[in-house]
Amino acid sequence: MNKPAKWIVRHRDKAPTVPCPCGSSTRILTRADGQSVVNLHVTHIQDSRLHYHKKCNEVYYILEGAGTMELDGKKVELTPGTVVYIPAGTRHRGCGDFKTVVVGTPAIEENDEYFD
């Protein structure tokens, strides 16, 4: 594991954007930065796949666009300014086309994404 970080400063423009099951994700703060407390991503969701995490809790803050979030089979409307807390174990997916800040705690591990 990397040496624990004292502090981290990074601009979104300097963070890598990668494809993910949700669309594309700019990984601003991750476990690879030497900390395991939290991750922070800006994700462009385009009809993501239903999935869940066994360890990671997530908070979504909708920046732009609109859609719905499916949470254990229930759909909720999403518009800019909406916050959604998703505890570990909740099957979820975003439907539509929107950008969101995703905060995960503890920082998500690569193998903590499960599909039914």
Where are the regions that the model predicts?
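Short, conserved beta-strand element in jelly-roll/cupin
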Residues: 42-45, 54-69
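A short glycine-rich, His/Asp/Glu-containing loop-to-beta-strand
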Residues: 14-50, 103, 112-114
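Short strand-coil-strand connectors
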Residues: 70-74, 97
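Short acidic-glycine-tyrosine-enriched beta hairpin
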Residues: 73-89
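Extreme N-terminal tail/first-helix region
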Residues: 2-20
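Ligand-binding loop in jelly-roll beta-barrel domains
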Residues: 88-113
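A cytosolic small-molecule/anion-sensing beta-strand core signal
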Residues: 41, 63-64, 79-80, 96
